């Protein structure tokens, strides 16, 4: 069996490709109506948490940064969902929300890493038209056009970086994945 950094990087890249292929099949099933948004989120969560790879400490490729985005986004959404459990103790609810916010901050770090590696080339960002009053004027979409990648954030830090790089368009648009974005889970 080969050893060394090259082999590990190759195995990691194969695992990342395998994950994104599986994720695309989940997206296709959701788009066809074969699964609910909650089922999609649960299966995606299981894929990143119980898969062959975990988050990368060293995000030295765009692919690793994008995997970390998915990993931390899945954990954030799962913890946020758990926090809405009825009759949950207030302290426990707060703990889950704090974990969710922590994971969202890690997701935003991965977002910035990927964008910086791309030098913000081929990136367009804008606010998303949402039904949620809480997310209105906060949620924005980041599109990496050449790769057909869509990311979302509410981070003021990410927003400021996008503005500084001149890729944020000061308008609200319908999300490219509007049905998903505006569907509650």
Where are these regions (language model features)?
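Charged, low-complexity interaction regions
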Residues: 30-39, 81-94, 167
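Short linear proline/tyrosine/threonine-rich motifs used for host-factor recruitment
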Residues: 35, 40, 140-144, 151
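Non-transmembrane amphipathic alpha-helical segments
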Residues: 23-26, 65, 69-72, 76-83, ...
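Short, charged, amphipathic alpha-helical segments
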Residues: 38-44, 89-109
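Amphipathic alpha-helical coiled-coil segments
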Residues: 51-58, 102-121
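A short, charged, amphipathic alpha-helix used as a generic interaction element across diverse proteins
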Residues: 155-166
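Short, charge/polar-rich alpha-helical segments
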Residues: 9-13, 31-34, 49-73
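Short terminal alpha-helical segments
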Residues: 8-42
